[in-house]
């Protein structure tokens, strides 16, 4: 992975944008898939139901609990349950939560992720707990107001009691372990003019400018030459190419292509990790996979060489 250049262009609490250069599309797509499905996180995996008099069936609530994002900054401190030395579930592989809410009021009570309590209280900010969610409305003092993720609403007299077990996993096992909800990349358009395009008259050039739905082209007011004003707006519809071919009978005036070694990534996390941490783990996983592939290729090559000498 030597020579690859990464430029971080935008960083927010849950989002980041970066440019990846000096690599091909196979590597870029591998990184995209790894960010989606191969970063270790923690999520609720098992749910034990002790009481549920709400209007929703047990499995509906259990499914919602599994999809609540849990802070996974310390995921490395935990083992996979199948790799743990314990006989069952210990603090090294399982985090226990309780959800026990009763509604004794006459109003409808909303149960949220704030009601999901870990059995052992942790003051550490990075402890495994539901991520913090804030309302767009601030309190009377102008401070952010934590509201939690809605789970269910209880009417008067209804109550629920669930025991939840959170474990380590990756998105390949189930999407609830995905650290990101968006991981996409786009390429940089490359628009090439033939020299003959400047021989078009001014009306033809204006028609070509108007043919583009995203207004990629423009006419220089001083020289009356056709120019590419914003190539990043190109969406590869090739309306300009069709215009040249059908109206001007010159199909080769414009060529639409893209750069093969530059990619623009957009990544949005679920909140379980900071975007930069997701990227760091993504590149680390990609390097491990490439190293493993190289070792296997070398091993197979050596075996074939020994077989040939026999």
Curated annotation (Swiss-Prot):
Coiled coil location: none
Gene Ontology molecular functions: DNA binding; DNA-directed RNA polymerase activity; protein dimerization activity
Keyword terms, alphabetized: DNA-directed RNA polymerase, Nucleotidyltransferase, Nucleus, Transcription, Transferase
Intracellular or extracellular location(s): Nucleus
Annotated Gene3D superfamilies: DNA-directed RNA polymerase, insert domain, RNA polymerase, RBP11-like subunit
Gene Ontology BP, a term: transcription by RNA polymerase II
GO CC, one annotated term: RNA polymerase II, core complex
Superkingdom classification of source: Eukaryota
CDD domains according to UniProt: RNAP_II_RPB3
Protein purpose: May be a stage-specific RNA polymerase subunit.
Family under the similarity heading: Belongs to the archaeal Rpo3/eukaryotic RPB3 RNA polymerase subunit family.
PANTHER family in UniProt: DNA-DIRECTED RNA POLYMERASE (PTHR11800), DNA-DIRECTED RNA POLYMERASE II SUBUNIT RPB3 (PTHR11800:SF2)
Name of the protein described by the UniProt record: Conjugation stage-specific protein
Lineage, uppermost ranks: Eukaryota, Sar, Alveolata, Ciliophora, Intramacronucleata
């Amino acid at each position: 992975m030597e020579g690859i250049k990464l430029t971080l262009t935008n960083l927010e609490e849950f989002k980041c944008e970066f440019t990846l250069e000096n690599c091909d599309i196979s590597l870029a797509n591998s990184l995209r898939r790894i960010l989606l499905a191969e970063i270790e996180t923690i999520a609720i995996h098992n749910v034990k139901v002790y009481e549920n008099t709400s209007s929703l069936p047990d499995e509906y609530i259990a499914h919602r609990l599994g999809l609540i994002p849990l802070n996974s900054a310390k995921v490395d401190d935990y083992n996979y349950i199948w790799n743990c030395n314990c006989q069952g579930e210990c603090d090294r592989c399982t985090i226990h939560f309780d959800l026990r809410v009763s509604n004794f009021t006459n109003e409808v009570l909303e149960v949220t992720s704030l009601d999901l309590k870990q059995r052992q209280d942790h003051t550490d900010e990075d402890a495994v707990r539901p991520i913090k969610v804030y309302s767009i409305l601030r309190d009377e003092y102008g401070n952010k107001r934590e509201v939690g993720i809605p789970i269910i609403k209880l009417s008067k007299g209804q109550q629920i009691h669930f025991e939840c077990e959170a474990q380590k996993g990756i998105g390949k096992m189930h999407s609830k372990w995905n650290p990101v909800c968006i991981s996409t990349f786009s390429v940089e358009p490359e628009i090439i003019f033939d020299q003959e395009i400047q021989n078009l008259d001014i009306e033809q050039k204006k028609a070509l400018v108007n043919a583009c739905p995203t207004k990629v082209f423009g006419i220089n007011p001083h020289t009356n030459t056709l120019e590419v004003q914003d190539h990043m707006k190109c969406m590869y519809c090739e309306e300009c190419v069709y215009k040249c071919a059908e109206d001007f009978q010159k199909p080769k005036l414009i060529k639409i292509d893209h750069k093969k070694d530059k990619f623009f990534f957009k990544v949005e996390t679920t909140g379980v990790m900071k975007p930069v941490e997701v990227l760091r783990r993504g590149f680390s996983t990609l390097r491990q996979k490439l190293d493993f592939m190289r070792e296997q290729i070398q091993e197979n090559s050596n075996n074939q060489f020994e077989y040939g000498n026999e």
